[in-house]
Curated annotation (Swiss-Prot):
Gene name per UniProt: ytjB
Membrane disposition: Single-pass membrane protein
Residues making up the signal peptide according to the UniProt record: 1-30
UniProt organism field: Escherichia coli (strain K12)
Subcellular location: Cell inner membrane
Organismal lineage: Bacteria, Pseudomonadati, Pseudomonadota, Gammaproteobacteria, Enterobacterales
Transmembrane regions: 164-184
UniProt modification remark: The signal sequence may not be cleaved.
Record's protein name: Probable inner membrane protein Smp
GO cellular component: plasma membrane
Disruption phenotype: No visible phenotype.
Length: 214
């Protein structure tokens, strides 16, 4: 009797631990889902930025085909590009690498690229360089600095989504427990005839009724 009782407790403990492990895995999966969604946004941002850079080079190219590039119009294009956007700074260089026009934050390129081991302003940024195409080769280059730093509000939104998913999983677990206890309360089914249960030797009411009819 004691051995059967011990087996029953071990069997029940294994089931409970297995269910808890599944619950933890589901909650971790919710966190992974939110983080993966955030990581997928960075390549999309880079792709959109490169498309924008190519469009800007098409607008700048006619202004650089003369011996003296139109610096004022190029500067106006760059100012519009960096005005209240995720583009921290933008610069146009000639084919020799000399700066023609620049707009945005006044941070040196050496500091922006962290060549000295220091990240300017603590930003997580990314550089994009797009050639300005001409008939006989590149007329110059356009350099953009993208701000890939996740804002506090965006990070908070990701955390809120993760917490909501976890809460939904816990609510699903609670609903399952309540339904199980409600539907099976006071009833014994055939699965309760398992040799691991203490009630295995007692007949199910359905069996009793069938025996009486016979």
């Amino acid at each position: 009797m004691a051995r059967t009782k011990l087996k029953f407790r071990l069997h029940r403990a294994v089931i409970v631990l297995f269910c808890l492990a599944l619950l933890v895995a589901l909650m971790q999966g919710a966190s992974w889902f939110s983080q993966n969604h955030q990581r997928q946004r960075n390549p999309q941002l880079e792709e959109l930025a490169r498309t924008l850079a190519r469009q800007v080079t098409l607008n700048v190219a006619p202004l650089m085909r003369t011996d003296s590039p139109d610096e004022k119009r190029i500067q106006a294009i760059l100012d519009q590009l960096t005005d209240e956007s995720r583009i921290l700074d933008a610069g146009v260089y000639d084919e020799q690498g000399d700066l023609i026009a620049r707009s945005g934050e006044s941070v040196e390129v050496r500091d922006r690229l962290a060549l000295d081991g220091k990240k300017a302003g603590g930003y997580f940024n990314q550089q994009i360089v797009e050639p300005i195409a001409g008939k006989n080769g590149p007329l110059g280059y356009l350099r953009l600095t993208l701000d890939t730093h996740t804002l506090a509000t965006e990070a908070q939104q990701v955390d809120n989504t993760t917490n909501i998913l976890r809460l939904m999983l816990l609510l699903s677990l609670a609903i399952g427990v309540v339904l199980t206890r409600t539907l099976l309360q006071g009833k014994r089914t055939r699965w309760q005839q398992s040799p691991f249960l203490l009630t295995a030797s007692k007949p199910v009411p359905e069996e009793e009724e069938s025996e009486k009819k016979e």
